[in-house]
Amino acid sequence: NIAATAQIEADTVQTDHSVEFLTDGDNGTYWLASEDSASAVITLRFPELKNISAVVLGEYLPLGQHIEQGEILAGKNKIADFTVVGHKRICMFDPVQTEELIIKITSSRTEAALRLLEVYQES
Protein backbone atom coordinates (compact mmCIF):
# COMPACT_ATOMS: atom_id res chain seq x y z
CA ASN A 1 0.00 0.00 0.00
CA ILE A 2 1.63 3.23 -1.17
CA ALA A 3 -1.20 5.68 -0.40
CA ALA A 4 0.56 7.01 2.71
CA THR A 5 3.53 8.11 0.59
CA ALA A 6 1.34 10.54 -1.36
CA GLN A 7 0.30 14.10 -0.63
CA ILE A 8 -3.48 13.82 -0.27
CA GLU A 9 -6.23 16.44 -0.48
CA ALA A 10 -9.99 16.58 -0.92
CA ASP A 11 -12.23 19.26 -2.39
CA THR A 12 -14.64 18.89 0.53
CA VAL A 13 -14.10 17.96 4.19
CA GLN A 14 -15.83 18.39 7.54
CA THR A 15 -13.94 19.70 10.57
CA ASP A 16 -12.33 16.92 12.65
CA HIS A 17 -12.55 14.41 9.77
CA SER A 18 -9.36 15.13 7.86
CA VAL A 19 -8.49 13.51 4.56
CA GLU A 20 -5.31 12.19 6.24
CA PHE A 21 -7.53 9.73 8.17
CA LEU A 22 -7.97 7.79 4.90
CA THR A 23 -4.44 6.40 5.14
CA ASP A 24 -3.82 6.19 8.90
CA GLY A 25 -4.78 2.49 9.17
CA ASP A 26 -7.28 3.17 11.98
CA ASN A 27 -10.80 1.83 11.30
CA GLY A 28 -12.21 4.25 13.88
CA THR A 29 -11.13 7.41 12.04
CA TYR A 30 -12.61 8.60 8.77
CA TRP A 31 -12.71 11.39 6.21
CA LEU A 32 -16.13 13.00 5.89
CA ALA A 33 -17.28 15.18 3.00
CA SER A 34 -19.06 18.45 3.75
CA GLU A 35 -22.72 18.25 4.73
CA ASP A 36 -25.15 17.58 1.89
CA SER A 37 -22.33 16.86 -0.59
CA ALA A 38 -23.44 14.36 -3.24
CA SER A 39 -19.98 14.31 -4.84
CA ALA A 40 -16.34 14.69 -3.85
CA VAL A 41 -12.84 14.58 -5.33
CA ILE A 42 -9.83 13.10 -3.52
CA THR A 43 -6.43 13.69 -5.11
CA LEU A 44 -3.21 11.82 -4.33
CA ARG A 45 0.11 13.20 -5.60
CA PHE A 46 3.12 10.91 -5.43
CA PRO A 47 6.72 12.22 -5.28
CA GLU A 48 7.60 10.17 -8.39
CA LEU A 49 5.95 8.06 -11.08
CA LYS A 50 4.21 4.97 -9.71
CA ASN A 51 3.00 1.92 -11.64
CA ILE A 52 -0.47 1.61 -10.08
CA SER A 53 -2.76 -1.40 -10.60
CA ALA A 54 -5.34 -1.32 -7.77
CA VAL A 55 -7.24 0.99 -5.43
CA VAL A 56 -9.15 -0.16 -2.34
CA LEU A 57 -11.88 1.99 -0.77
CA GLY A 58 -13.85 1.40 2.43
CA GLU A 59 -16.78 3.37 3.84
CA TYR A 60 -17.19 4.21 7.52
CA LEU A 61 -20.28 2.05 7.98
CA PRO A 62 -21.49 3.33 11.40
CA LEU A 63 -22.66 6.41 9.43
CA GLY A 64 -24.27 4.27 6.73
CA GLN A 65 -23.52 3.12 3.21
CA HIS A 66 -23.94 6.15 0.97
CA ILE A 67 -21.52 6.05 -1.98
CA GLU A 68 -23.29 4.86 -5.13
CA GLN A 69 -20.87 5.62 -7.96
CA GLY A 70 -17.46 7.00 -8.82
CA GLU A 71 -14.41 6.85 -11.03
CA ILE A 72 -10.65 6.69 -10.72
CA LEU A 73 -8.34 8.78 -12.89
CA ALA A 74 -4.60 8.71 -13.50
CA GLY A 75 -4.03 12.37 -14.22
CA LYS A 76 -6.80 13.23 -16.70
CA ASN A 77 -7.31 9.67 -17.97
CA LYS A 78 -10.13 7.56 -16.51
CA ILE A 79 -8.83 4.11 -15.59
CA ALA A 80 -11.74 2.60 -13.63
CA ASP A 81 -15.35 3.05 -12.56
CA PHE A 82 -16.81 1.80 -9.30
CA THR A 83 -20.25 1.42 -7.78
CA VAL A 84 -21.36 0.85 -4.18
CA VAL A 85 -18.32 0.90 -1.86
CA GLY A 86 -19.62 -0.52 1.44
CA HIS A 87 -17.13 -2.29 3.74
CA LYS A 88 -14.55 -2.67 0.97
CA ARG A 89 -14.46 -2.06 -2.78
CA ILE A 90 -11.39 -3.39 -4.61
CA CYS A 91 -10.82 -1.71 -7.97
CA MET A 92 -8.27 -3.54 -10.14
CA PHE A 93 -7.13 -2.30 -13.54
CA ASP A 94 -4.30 -2.59 -16.04
CA PRO A 95 -1.15 -1.02 -14.56
CA VAL A 96 -0.79 2.68 -15.31
CA GLN A 97 2.13 5.02 -14.63
CA THR A 98 1.17 8.24 -12.91
CA GLU A 99 2.21 10.78 -10.30
CA GLU A 100 -1.40 11.86 -9.71
CA LEU A 101 -4.34 9.63 -8.80
CA ILE A 102 -7.84 11.09 -8.53
CA ILE A 103 -10.79 9.40 -6.84
CA LYS A 104 -14.07 11.03 -7.90
CA ILE A 105 -17.21 10.19 -5.97
CA THR A 106 -19.84 11.15 -8.54
CA SER A 107 -22.97 10.01 -6.69
CA SER A 108 -23.62 9.65 -2.98
CA ARG A 109 -26.95 9.56 -1.12
CA THR A 110 -25.51 12.06 1.37
CA GLU A 111 -22.00 13.12 2.36
CA ALA A 112 -19.45 10.36 1.84
CA ALA A 113 -17.54 8.92 4.80
CA LEU A 114 -14.46 6.85 3.94
CA ARG A 115 -12.28 5.07 6.51
CA LEU A 116 -9.93 3.44 4.02
CA LEU A 117 -7.99 4.35 0.89
CA GLU A 118 -5.24 2.00 -0.27
CA VAL A 119 -3.22 2.17 -3.49
CA TYR A 120 -1.16 -0.72 -4.83
CA GLN A 121 1.50 -0.73 -7.47
CA GLU A 122 2.62 -3.43 -9.86
CA SER A 123 5.95 -4.84 -8.69
Labelled PLM ranges:
Residues 1-52, 60-66, 111, 118-123:
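Disordered, acidic Ser/Thr/Pro-rich linker "stalks" and the adjacent N-terminal cap
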Residues 35-39, 50, 61-123:
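Trp- and acidic/polar-enriched beta-sheet ligand-binding modules for extracellular glycan
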